[in-house]
Curated annotation (Swiss-Prot):
This is Endoribonuclease YbeY. GO terms for cellular component: cytoplasm. Belongs to the endoribonuclease YbeY family. The gene is ybeY. It comes from Pseudomonas putida (strain ATCC 47054 / DSM 6125 / CFBP 8728 / NCIMB 11950 / KT2440). The keyword Membrane does not apply. Binds 1 zinc ion. The keyword rRNA processing applies. One of its GO terms (biological process) is rRNA processing. PROSITE patterns: UPF0054 (PS01306). HAMAP family: Endoribonucl_YbeY. One of its GO terms (molecular function) is zinc ion binding. Single strand-specific metallo-endoribonuclease involved in late-stage 70S ribosome quality control and in maturation of the 3' terminus of the 16S rRNA. It is found in: Cytoplasm. Its EC number is 3.1.-.-.
Amino acid sequence: MLELDIQRATDAATPEDAALRRWCELALRQRSADSEMTIRLVDEAEGRELNHTYRHKDYATNVLSFPADVPDDLLDIPLLGDLVICVAVVEREAAEQGKSLEAHWAHLVIHGCLHLLGYDHIEDEEAEEMESLERELLAELGHPDPYADDETDTITH
């Protein structure tokens, strides 16, 4: 079971809770244990502030992942961590890249969840594994390969 806390810190239109949950559960299905996580949907100012504070980059990015660093045995439900998603960046990227907004949202939520599971894309081999899993999960939802069109269509964080 996934205990999902969704925080909307913006007045912008965002996906419904059920869609966010569906994307998280799909990405996390390889994890058999119950889990807890938070998704915080933010405006550009908060996105920029968090990206600057934690990554020393002075711009808002699409998704930030904050994996929990608490041993599972200390908690009733293992805490995976938090995702922070900047709504304006998601909307802008989808428009610029000619992607449906729903497909881009699904991609970024899945991408962030995979980071919470320990996947990364710093090294080429890690990136290939992570992107392959993203493609597979998005295909299950009926969404196209997010990396197919252009090498610049990569995750910006």
